[in-house]
Amino acid sequence: MTVNPDAPALPTLPLAVETIQGLLPHRYPFALVDRIIDYVPGERAVGIKNVTFNEPQFQGHFPGRPLMPGVLIVEAMAQVGGVIVTLMPDMPQGLFVFAGIDQVRFRRPVVPGDQLVLSAQLLSVKRRRFCKIQGEAMVDGQLAASGELLFSLVE
């Protein structure tokens, strides 16, 4: 296991999509964070996802009544959490993937034109391989989704 010596120092906010792509492996159509607007090292991050009608999932989910799939809302929360973990200088190199999703609840639909405000709070890190994050997705100040997300390092 190697330590990530290339983890960036404290970033200048906001983080634009180009910077986020330097931190996370996700690319279109699964790069779901447009901007990081708040970041506290090793603790929390807040990101923005602008939901647009031209995203591929809306072709079939659902014709005539487009709704952002819940799994993509959860993935967007996870990507914000991934920024926290990736910027931790003592974390090993590798790919963090889902190990579990607990207590996820969806409270309101997310539709094209909405702006998701995605919050991630780091709850725990175990053996530098497992992380637990509390995520929330808000639209217009209303809770759209929340839950605990667990990650595991794949080397």
Curated annotation (Swiss-Prot):
Gene Ontology cellular component annotations, sorted alphabetically: cytoplasm; membrane
What GO MF terms are annotated? (3R)-hydroxyacyl-[acyl-carrier-protein] dehydratase activity
EC nos = 4.2.1.59
Mind telling me which Pfam families this protein's record contains? Answer: FabA
The catalytic site is made up of H61
Gene3D superfamilies in alphabetical order: Hotdog Thioesterase
Question: What family does this chain come from, according to its entry?
Answer: Belongs to the thioester dehydratase family. FabZ subfamily.
Q: Which domain of life is it from?
A: Bacteria
Q: Which reaction does it catalyse?
A: a (3R)-hydroxyacyl-[ACP] = a (2E)-enoyl-[ACP] + H2O
Any idea which UniProt keywords this protein has? Cytoplasm, Lipid A biosynthesis, Lipid biosynthesis, Lipid metabolism, Lyase
Q: What does this protein do?
A: Involved in unsaturated fatty acids biosynthesis. Catalyzes the dehydration of short chain beta-hydroxyacyl-ACPs and long chain saturated and unsaturated beta-hydroxyacyl-ACPs.
The protein's organism comes out as Synechococcus elongatus (strain ATCC 33912 / PCC 7942 / FACHB-805)
Name it.
3-hydroxyacyl-[acyl-carrier-protein] dehydratase FabZ
Indicate where this protein is primarily found. cytoplasm
Q: Which GO terms describe its biological process?
A: fatty acid biosynthetic process; lipid A biosynthetic process
Q: Where in the cell is it found?
A: Cytoplasm
